């Protein structure tokens, strides 16, 4: 939360599905120890940083461990009893310092379909609003507010959260202080003016966007773990104006620290109202010095992280929403997110390696064809070394170290494969075989750097999955053939006329939707802008105000955010927001 406070984020939503008192046993109260050591410190951090710690409950779930424990609407007696228990649970956290609440119905039974929305969700939200207003009026003996700073803003996520265009006029009956969460037309939806305008036209309310990005939960269905360090071109669409959204909430990765990169961009998007894709590209470029060492000035370490992150942008959505007719959406259910595209044009990783891979697959590569590729892999190798030697934030480095080690070995193997191929083409096959063996060992070693996935299963950390790694595999096959070495089946790849990514990385489609950490961003395009997840550790150096861009002076009034460990609670949902909102 402290980190987020530097960048104008203003809301952090606590909704961890692995906390049984959040959903499965929502009636249960926290122990005194839990209040003192878990809830109260987070509430205090939120109040101090101006990034409100919002406590959420999900009382409508009726499955698994929560079966039969849900909030009931079948009789008036049950409703009043459960409402009393709901208030008591919220009250326990309000007494501990919480100053805003949220009510979630996502992934739960749609009780509105059974009893009517006005008799269920609308009624609960109205009753909670009235109750909050009563608490706001309570005074201490000296006349001061008993719950100073208590907000009546309630974040509400409906059971049908994707919204595909139906009227849903009942949303108009929800109190105006309630913010309605939507994922943008599909589970892995986008923040776009088109969606927001449709929702507002049909419901009379602006949506609070919940974007499942940079969420990497669906790599639980892959043989490896990846980081999502880009994708703003697909998930944060330009063209929004003030009031388009009521907020933007991001679902980050299990790795909280690198999630700050997407969170930073969402806050920038919210406050600065991107009007072109170039705005997003500039935000991506700018983000690394801020997430690495809280400064507008790039360092050797942050530049190294940037060069690697350029090749770690893909997001697997598991095919939850079906195939998309989008050039950036691969048939293997992956958003490519401009992976290996250098927005500055200085290092054409995609162009150079795509051209080389075509020649490698066709068996036509010559010694002269390896020069530019060698520059690419050498640059990436140097980037990994520079970041390892100069990390600006130890927490960040610790969380992504397996990927840095992966890049160390992958680039070493690529350079040796190129050397072996050139030696073989020059006729020195014996030396080429020895060099090839060294390259093969380095490639195998690159898969030994593991990290726990969503289900706490250790898997190898990988990157460069669209362009960089497939080209290394093509180099292996070419070097093996030209040197007379034998390529193990595990590394042999079928030839393809397609020189870009052939999706053969063990991905499997899944229809399970993500449920990890959620953050949020809220801003001018949203009422308030916001969003971030990260570990609650003291920030690095004191932040330096970011210089304004020519198009806006918003850099100096950037986002507020929040920090919290999403690795300790892998199923945590968090939200953050930034921007001006009513002080009520």
Predicted features and spans:
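Trp- and acidic/polar-enriched beta-sheet ligand-binding modules for extracellular glycan
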Residues: 562-584
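Aromatic-lined carbohydrate-binding surfaces of glycoside hydrolases
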Residues: 1-180
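Exposed aromatic-hydrophobic patches
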Residues: 234, 540-542, 584
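Disordered, acidic Ser/Thr/Pro-rich linker "stalks" and the adjacent N-terminal cap
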Residues: 438, 444-447, 451, 473, ...
């Amino acid at each position: 939360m402290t980190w987020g406070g530097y960048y104008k984020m203003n809301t952090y939503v606590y909704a961890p599905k692995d906390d049984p008192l959040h959903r499965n046993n929502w009636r249960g109260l926290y122990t005194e120890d839990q209040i003192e050591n878990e809830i109260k410190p987070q509430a205090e951090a939120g109040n101090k940083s101006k990034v409100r710690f919002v406590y959420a409950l999900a009382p409508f779930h009726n499955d698994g461990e929560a079966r039969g424990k849900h909030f009931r609407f079948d009789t008036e007696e049950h409703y009043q009893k459960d409402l009393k228990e709901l208030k008591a649970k919220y009250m326990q956290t309000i007494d501990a310092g919480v100053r805003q609440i949220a009510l979630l119905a996502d992934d739960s039974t749609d009780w509105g379909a059974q009893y009517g929305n006005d008799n269920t969700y609308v009624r609960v939200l109205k009753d909670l609003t009235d109750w909050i207003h009563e608490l706001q009026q309570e005074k201490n003996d000296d006349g001061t507010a008993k719950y100073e700073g208590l907000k009546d803003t309630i974040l509400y996520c409906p059971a049908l959260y994707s919204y595909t265009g139906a009227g849903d006029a009942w949303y108009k009956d929800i109190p105006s202080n309630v913010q309605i969460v939507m994922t943008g037309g599909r589970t892995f939806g986008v923040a776009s003016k088109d969606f927001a305008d449709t929702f507002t036209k049909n419901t009379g309310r602006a949506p609070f966007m919940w974007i499942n990005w940079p969420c990497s939960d669906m790599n639980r269905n892959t043989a490896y773990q990846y980081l999502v360090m880009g994708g703003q071109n697909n998930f944060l669409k330009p063209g929004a104006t003030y009031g388009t959204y009521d907020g933007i909430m991001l679902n980050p990765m299990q790795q909280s620290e690198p999630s700050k990169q997407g969170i930073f961009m969402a806050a920038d998007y919210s406050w600065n109202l991107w009007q072109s894709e170039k705005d997003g590209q500039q935000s991506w470029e700018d983000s690394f010095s801020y997430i690495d060492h809280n400064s507008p000035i790039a360092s050797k370490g942050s530049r190294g992280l940037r060069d690697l992150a350029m090749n770690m942008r893909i997001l697997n959505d598991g095919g939850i929403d079906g195939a998309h007719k989008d050039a950036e959406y691969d048939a293997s259910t992956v958003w490519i997110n401009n992976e290996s595209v250098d927005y500055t044009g200085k290092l054409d990783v995609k162009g150079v390696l795509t051209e080389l891979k075509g020649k490698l697959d066709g068996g036509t590569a010559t010694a002269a064809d390896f020069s530019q590729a060698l520059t690419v892999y050498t640059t990436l190798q140097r980037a990994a070394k520079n970041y390892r030697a100069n990390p600006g934030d130890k927490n960040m480095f610790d969380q992504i170290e397996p990927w840095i080690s992966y890049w160390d070995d992958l680039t070493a193997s690529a350079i040796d494969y190129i050397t072996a191929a050139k030696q073989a083409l020059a006729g020195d096959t014996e030396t080429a075989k020895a060099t090839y063996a060294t390259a093969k060992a380095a490639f195998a070693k690159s898969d030994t750097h593991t990290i726990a996935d969503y289900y706490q299963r250790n898997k190898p950390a990988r990157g460069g999955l669209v362009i960089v790694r497939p080209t290394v595999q093509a180099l292996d096959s070419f070097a093996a053939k030209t040197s007379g070495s034998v390529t193990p089946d595990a590394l042999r790849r079928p030839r393809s006329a397609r020189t870009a990514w052939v999706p053969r990385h063990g991905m499997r489609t899944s229809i399970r939707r993500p449920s990890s950490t959620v953050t949020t961003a809220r801003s001018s395009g949203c009422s308030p802008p916001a969003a971030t997840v990260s570990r609650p550790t003291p920030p690095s150096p004191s932040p330096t105000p970011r210089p304004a861009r020519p198009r806006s002076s918003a850099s100096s009034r950037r986002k507020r955010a929040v920090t919290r460990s999403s690795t300790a609670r892998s199923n945590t949902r968090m939200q953050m927001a930034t921007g001006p909102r009513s002080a009520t």
